[in-house]
Amino acid sequence: MIVTTTPSVEGRQIAEYLGIVSAEAIMGANFFRDLAASITDLIGGRAGSYESKLREGREECLRELVAEAARLGADAVVGVDIDYEVVGESMLMVTASGTAVRLR
């Protein structure tokens, strides 16, 4: 399945808009404690553990987005937007949304 942040798929026409699809992933209460414990992972100014958790949340959301679009009979999800938000003091929420479409 094609998943893109653009509003269309180059070289293909959108035959039908099937609706908005969305997914959420929440990283649990130990996320920030684990992050603080792994600050030693800083390599070249980057926190490897933090990036790993963000990537894990993003990948989970995209998997769910594709699954929801497939249930609708979509060929692609266009206009994908991914957001990150801290919830409370101890959780991170990753959300993804887009429009499921059928292509010609």
Swiss-Prot record:
Taxonomic superkingdom:
Bacteria
Q: Which PANTHER family match?
A: UPF0145 PROTEIN YBJQ (PTHR34068:SF1)
**Which cysteines form disulfides?**
none
- InterPro entries under this entry? UPF0145_dom_sf (IPR035439), UPF0145_YbjQ-like (IPR002765)
Residues folding into a coiled coil are none
Organism of this sequence: Symbiobacterium thermophilum (strain DSM 24528 / JCM 14929 / IAM 14863 / T)
Under which name does UniProt file this protein? UPF0145 protein STH1265
Which family is this sequence assigned to? Belongs to the UPF0145 family.
